[in-house]
């Protein structure tokens, strides 16, 4: 449920697209 924070994270950014 954390998409904006993921987009800002380099490790989770790949999940943003």
Swiss-Prot record:
Residues 1-4 form a propeptide. Disulfide bonds join 6-12, 7-16. One of its GO terms (molecular function) is ion channel regulator activity. The modification Cysteine amide is found at residue 16. Changing residue 10 to P: Gain of ability to compete with alpha-bungarotoxin. It comes from the Eukaryota. Expressed by the venom duct. One of its GO terms (cellular component) is host cell postsynaptic membrane. Negative results: does not inhibit alpha-2-beta-2, alpha-2-beta-4, alpha-3-beta-4, alpha-4-beta-2, alpha-4-beta-2 nAChRs. Alpha-conotoxins act on postsynaptic membranes, they bind to the nicotinic acetylcholine receptors (nAChR) and thus inhibit them. This toxin blocks neuronal mammalian alpha-7 (human and rat) and alpha-3/beta-2 (human) and muscle alpha-1-beta-1-delta-epsilon (human) nAChRs. Acts voltage-independently. Does not compete with alpha-bungarotoxin for binding to the receptor. Binds to a different site than alpha-conotoxin ImI. Belongs to the conotoxin A superfamily. This is Alpha-conotoxin ImII.
């Amino acid at each position: 449920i954390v998409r904006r924070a993921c987009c800002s994270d380099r490790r989770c950014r790949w999940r943003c697209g």
